[in-house]
Design a protein with these regions (language model features):
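Conserved N-terminal catalytic core of the sugar/cofactor nucleotidyltransferase
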Residues: 1-12, 20, 34, 38-112, ...
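Histidine-centered beta-alpha loop that forms part of the nucleotide-sugar donor binding/catalytic region
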Residues: 15, 61, 140-141
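A generic "binding-loop/recognition-motif" signal
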Residues: 17, 28, 63, 216
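Conserved catalytic-core motifs of eukaryotic protein kinase domains, centered on the activation segment
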Residues: 23-26
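A structural signal for short hydrophobic beta-strand segments in well-ordered beta-sheet cores
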Residues: 32, 150-153, 199, 210
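Catalytic-core segments of class I nucleotidyltransferases/pyrophosphorylases
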Residues: 106-109, 116, 122-129, 143, ...
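A short, conserved acidic/glycine-rich loop-to-beta-strand motif
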Residues: 131-141
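Acceptor/aglycone-binding surface of glycosyltransferases and processive sugar-polymer synthases
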Residues: 147-160
Length: 238
């Protein structure tokens, strides 16, 4: 199978307030929640390094100084830059602002800052190229769940529907890693939701394709999973 050079830019949405985590994590942005002796965000940056990212742009807002002071302008040889939200821009607005640091004609990876999905970025990017996708979306197969909505696709992997949360025996959820071009968001307003204003309403307008995996996935957005991350992440990724 032909392979293509990987993007070297990634955006991480690191501006989360961590509202649901306040019972166990206080006074830091959600991606800075401690996992053992280091912040959750460092695990995401390790994934970036592993896949050859040379330039990571952190979309930050709430207590952004905490992140900047901890990580500075580099991480394991990878340049770090910060796209600071002075007011909440939504996930789409935050991504759009951060992508201004990237070459407009080069695709970039985009990651949620409160989930870690150990899917294969190379395969996700191959999907983006080979399908001529506007956006490639990582999907995680889940079993017996009601916490997430599901993404339905056709036999080629193209998205046909985003479905609301309800109990399901099995389904594919959005894993929170994307490939897209900065040009895609140029005409959107400064404040919008990537999920609600782009993905959910653009199935007919954009070519949304998917790569499905059952690789390790964790969402630290609720206390129970955050506690689980304390043991699982050091065991799996140290």
């Amino acid at each position: 199978m032909q392979t293509y050079p990987m993007p070297t830019q990634a955006v991480i949405l690191a501006g989360g307030l961590g509202t649901r985590l306040r019972s166990v994590v206080r006074d830091v942005p959600k991606p800075m929640a401690a996992i053992g002796e280091r912040p959750f965000l460092s695990y995401l940056l390790d994934e970036c390094v592993r896949y050859g990212i040379r330039d990571a742009i952190l979309a930050v807002g709430y207590l952004h100084e905490t992140i900047q002071q901890y990580f500075g302008d580099a991480y394991k040889g990878m340049r770090l830059r910060y796209a600071i939200e002075d007011e909440p821009l939504g996930t789409g607005g935050a991504v759009k602002q951060a992508l201004r640091y990237c070459p407009p004609d080069m695709p970039a990876f985009v990651l949620n800052g409160d989930t870690l999905f150990a899917t294969d970025w190379q395969q996700l990017y191959q999907c983006y190229i080979q399908q001529g996708a506007d956006i490639a979306i990582s999907l995680r197969t889940m079993h017996h769940f009601d916490r997430y909505g599901v993404v339905e696709t056709d036999s080629t992997g193209r998205v046909t529907a985003f479905c609301e949360k309800q109990y399901r025996e099995i389904g594919n959820i959005n894993g929170g890693i994307y490939v897209l071009s900065p040009l895609l968001l140029c005409n959107y307003p400064d404040r919008f939701s990537l999920e609600q204003d782009v993905l959910s309403v653009s199935i007919q307008h954009y070519r949304l394709y998917t790569h499905v995996s059952e690789s390790y996935f964790i969402d630290i957005g609720i206390p129970d999973d955050y506690r689980r991350a304390q043991t699982e992440l050091p065991q799996l990724f140290e």
